[in-house]
């Protein structure tokens, strides 16, 4: 593997220095991180020719395991989802192509590890198959002798059957103890997870996440070891960690859980997740940075904080606006639900989403949500509800913690946590209304309109920076969404989303 060209290195250095240098130093332009803003944790990526595919943990959101496609590694479009039913909290998938088939291996928390397959990443994906093995974060690898293995958290692996659809009992073994985190570093502990196995040239590389995925800002990291054989022994890189947050003042916190990926012309990148400093409740976002393989066969970074500045684009950019199609209510691609959901409840026709009401509040009504990913935004929708239904907007962490505004026969409702809403009588018995929620850098406020033109601000607001995993656990984020509770139907139309300064 050759070193990066002098031109490429010069471009990277110039861009790192606050983009000092003409655009000609980056022939395809530049990109800034994140490449997927918002809650897209535990990224796994695969290249098939000139096409890239990626998926992430979906946790308690359903449909799960959205598959993304890109031609340039920067702009991503959702193309399918691999899980149609709710199995539980889905963790740390791995998407790979073995032979002519695509596989996604994944963990269902407190249950087992599973696999789904498809002939193309566009689906359809198979029903999930139980692999009958514990641990988390599965990653398949096929040895030089053709034996299939499944690598797991804690530096362990287990044999797979020839078809890759089950594990072989009695073959679980530990192959690497992980990189020893230096004394004095502030982390959550070793927490070795997220194994990714790649063969480049004559070397097998074991890429692992360590340090804990949340906790203090300096917790997470990417460590690498290598071996001439999948059987080991594994030699640790003298340049570990490849990715890490060193300072609390950095923009990106808890950087880790990396996957290596190459371009057709032999350049290398790593995708991983990180929290944004001060915005934990956006979730772990997906970042991309270039790396290189030195003459001694070790992976190297271009700089400690290269991800904070514009970076030379790897390929000709093909922009895609992820928010542009929210008004189409594409369930499973742009929109999802919290935990189990009956798909027969939803119908989309001529730009109108009709939801069958259920439950009594956002806590048990399975809100329909999307990933905003912006520090400040507002969203609004026109609502037409049956008299027995309660409808509204939320920014939702889980069934206990959410913020929002609804409308029922009793008037306007303010939703906060899992408590009953506070009512304003001025909108009593209104069935047709426009609602808007604004999240202005974690200060949430609500607005309503009776004609879609004249808006009035409601008399409440709340600060939501504490609504995050380090407080509430569950690895969720604050997602904007729609609620239909009570009895009857709610019709949502004219949905709008705006990013704010």
What is each PLM-predicted segment?
Residues 8-17:
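Bacterial N-terminal signal peptides
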Residues 19-501:
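Carbohydrate-active catalytic/glycan-binding domains of CAZyme proteins
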Residues 1-8:
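Bacterial N-terminal signal peptides that target proteins for export
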């Amino acid at each position: 593997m050759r070193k990066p060209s002098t031109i490429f290195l010069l471009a990277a250095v110039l861009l790192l220095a606050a983009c000092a240098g003409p655009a000609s130093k980056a022939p395809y332009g530049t990109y800034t991180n994140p490449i997927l803003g918002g809650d897209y944790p535990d990224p796994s990526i695969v290249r098939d020719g000139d096409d890239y595919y990626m998926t992430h943990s979906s946790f308690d959101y359903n449909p799960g395991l959205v598959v993304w496609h890109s031609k340039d590694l920067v702009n991503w479009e959702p193309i399918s989802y691999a899980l149609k039913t709710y199995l539980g909290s889905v963790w740390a998938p791995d998407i790979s192509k073995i032979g002519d088939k695509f596989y996604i291996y994944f963990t269902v928390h407190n249950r087992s590890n599973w696999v789904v397959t498809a002939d193309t990443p566009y689906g359809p994906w198979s029903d999930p198959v139980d692999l009958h093995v514990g641990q988390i974060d599965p990653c398949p690898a096929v040895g030089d002798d053709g034996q299939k293995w499944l690598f797991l958290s804690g530096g362990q692996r287990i044999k797979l059957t020839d078809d890759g659809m089950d594990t072989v009992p009695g073959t679980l073994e530990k192959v690497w103890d992980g990189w020893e985190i230096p004394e004095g570093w502030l982390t959550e502990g070793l927490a070795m997870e997220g194994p990714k196995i790649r063969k480049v040239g004559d070397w097998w590389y074991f890429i692992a996440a360590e340090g804990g995925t949340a906790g203090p800002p300096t917790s997470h990291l990417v460590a690498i070891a290598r071996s001439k054989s999948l059987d080991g022994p594994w030699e640790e890189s003298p340049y570990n960690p490849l990715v890490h947050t060193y300072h609390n003042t950095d923009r990106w916190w808890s950087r880790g859980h990396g996957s290596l990926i190459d371009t057709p012309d032999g350049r290398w990148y790593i995708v991983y997740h990180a929290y944004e400093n001060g915005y934990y409740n956006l979730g772990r976002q997906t970042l991309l940075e270039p790396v290189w393989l030195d003459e001694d066969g070790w992976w190297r970074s271009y700089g400690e904080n290269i991800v904070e500045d514009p970076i030379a684009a790897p390929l000709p950019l093909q922009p895609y606006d992820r928010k542009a199609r929210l008004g189409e209510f594409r369930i499973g691609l742009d929109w999802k639900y919290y935990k189990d959901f009956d798909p027969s409840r939803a119908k989309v026709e001529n730009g109108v989403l009709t939801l069958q009401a259920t439950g009594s509040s956002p806590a048990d009504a399975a809100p329909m949500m999307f990933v905003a990913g912006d520090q400040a935004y507002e969203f609004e929708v026109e609502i037409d509800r049956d008299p027995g239904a309660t409808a509204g907007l939320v920014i939702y962490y889980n069934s206990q913690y959410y913020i929002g505004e609804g409308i029922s026969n009793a008037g306007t409702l303010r939703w906060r946590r899992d408590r009953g809403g506070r009512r304003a009588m001025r909108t009593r018995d209104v069935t047709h209304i426009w609602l808007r929620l604004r999240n202005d850098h974690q200060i949430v406020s609500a607005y309503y309109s009776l004609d879609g033109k004249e808006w009035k601000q409601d008399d409440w607001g709340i600060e939501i920076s504490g609504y995050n995993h380090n407080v509430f656990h569950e690895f969720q984020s604050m997602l904007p969404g729609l609620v239909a509770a009570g009895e009857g139907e709610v019709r949502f139309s004219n949905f709008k989303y705006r990013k704010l300064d």
